[in-house]
UniProtKB/Swiss-Prot annotation:
Protein name: Putative F-box only protein 9
Alphabetized InterPro entries for the sequence: F-box-assoc_dom_typ1, F-box-assoc_interact_dom, F-box-like_dom_sf, F-box_dom, SCF_F-box_component
CDD domains for this protein: F-box_AtFBW1-like
A Pfam family hit: F-box
PANTHER family: BNACNNG10540D PROTEIN (PTHR31672), F-BOX PROTEIN CPR30-LIKE (PTHR31672:SF13)
Domain F-box: 1-44
Encoding gene, per UniProt annotation: FBX9
Naturally occurring in which organism (per UniProt): Arabidopsis thaliana
């Protein structure tokens, strides 16, 4: 390829999946320099195939998984835990309490209440400063503002606060990577809904979405990082008695599982467009049945799930069962349980749909050399 014009080489490499291109990074100086070129990484993000990988959070760690889906016998291979070491603390292991994925970046809340952004593919990290203002039970999400030339990443942080002794409200902050600082977005907003997911929500096309509940109905709550405002959207079902969980498919589709307490069926709904607050098109992609379970077993309600579109299979972690992954197929009432190594933490493990990317973590100029060492 050394005889090809540089523009053509760049165009070819921009179509190579991130994990494959990473192996070619040090083939020559020209290719290595592309990894530091933001224009190229933006081009690669738009053109390269999205290869979805499965990560499992459990016991304060993130573990890659390989899932073999076969109706004659499915299996799961758990690979080595991704090692994240902190050079600020004698290269000690970083224990991750929560993880949120956006564009190949992992926003991690640590066990000792710190916050960092991590690109496992590139081995880059950036610690986020709280300025001694950490709030217990804060929720965090990562998204971006859509610019013409590139994406500008931000972090949303919100937590509950008492407006009066008997009245609870919410407070919202936005973190800007360029200034390494937080600013107040909304202060002391009256709380008239509740988030009904135990997870942190999901990222879809740069925005974050959660399942929420008010006095009358379930709905989808979205945060637009470009406009910096919340929006309320419809769900396939809005009954308060139903159980729903959000997921994403290769960062291209938003998916929701729907279970009714009175039914043995789980419906999988999907959409690839969210145009406005009033119009949103959900399509029921397939359904799975739990008829194979005996009457003495309660239905397994999932707290996270992934789907295989081609085989129409749901892979889920189960509420209240820290040591099991369920695999349910739409055909022939297929059902299997795959054990997970025992956990020492009383929270159910959950899946993270991870798509490796070359997205660079924007470093504040004053802290460009203050990076955490990473081992994978």
């Amino acid at each position: 390829m050394s005889d090809l014009p540089p523009d053509l080489v760049e165009d070819i490499l921009s179509r190579v999946p991130a994990t494959s291109l990473k192996r070619l990074r040090f083939t020559c100086k020209q290719w290595n320099s592309l990894f530091k070129n933001r224009r190229f990484t933006e081009k690669h993000f738009c053109k390269a195939p999205k290869q979805s990988h499965v990560l499992l959070w459990k016991d304060y760690t993130v573990c890659p998984m390989s899932i073999n889906l076969n109706f004659s016998g499915s299996s799961i291979e758990f690979k080595s835990v991704l090692s994240l070491k902190d050079s600020h603390y004698n290269s000690e292991q970083v224990y991750i309490a929560k993880v949120f994925h956006c564009d190949g970046l992992l926003l991690c809340t640590t066990k000792d209440h710190r916050l960092l952004v991590w690109n496992p593919c590139l081995g880059e990290t950036r610690w986020i400063n709280f300025e001694n203002d950490y709030k217990p039970y804060s929720r965090f999400s990562l998204g971006y503002k859509n610019n013409k030339s590139c994406r500008s990443y931000k972090i949303l942080r919100f937590w509950t606060s008492y407006l009066t002794p008997n009245h609870i409200g919410l407070r919202y902050n936005i973190y800007e990577f360029t200034t390494d600082s937080w600013r107040v977005l909304i202060d002391k907003v009256s709380l008239n809904y509740f988030l009904i997911e135990s997870e942190n929500g999901v990222s879809f096309k740069g925005n974050t979405y959660w399942l929420a509940l008010d006095e009358e109905t379930n709905f989808l709550l979205g945060f637009d990082f470009t406009m910096e405002r919340f929006k309320r959207l419809c769900l396939p079902s809005n009954k308060n008695c139903d159980t729903m969980v959000l997921s994403v498919v290769r960062e291209e589709k938003l998916s929701v599982s729907h279970q009714n307490f009175c039914s043995s069926k789980m419906d999988i709904w999907m959409t690839n467009r969210i145009d406005s607050e009033t119009a949103m098109s959900w399509k029921r992609y397939f359904s799975v049945e739990f008829k194979i379970l005996s009457m003495c077993h309660s239905l397994p309600f999932c707290n996270s799930f992934l789907i295989d579109e081609e085989k129409k299979i749901v892979i889920s972690t189960v509420r209240g069962n820290e040591n099991m992954v369920n695999i349910i197929g739409a055909y022939n009432a297929y059902y299997a349980e795959v054990p997970v190594e025992s956990t020492n933490w009383p929270c159910s493990p959950y899946f993270v749909s991870y798509v490796p990317s070359l997205v660079q973590i924007q470093q504040c100029k004053s802290k460009e050399n203050n990076k955490t060492s990473l081992e994978m």
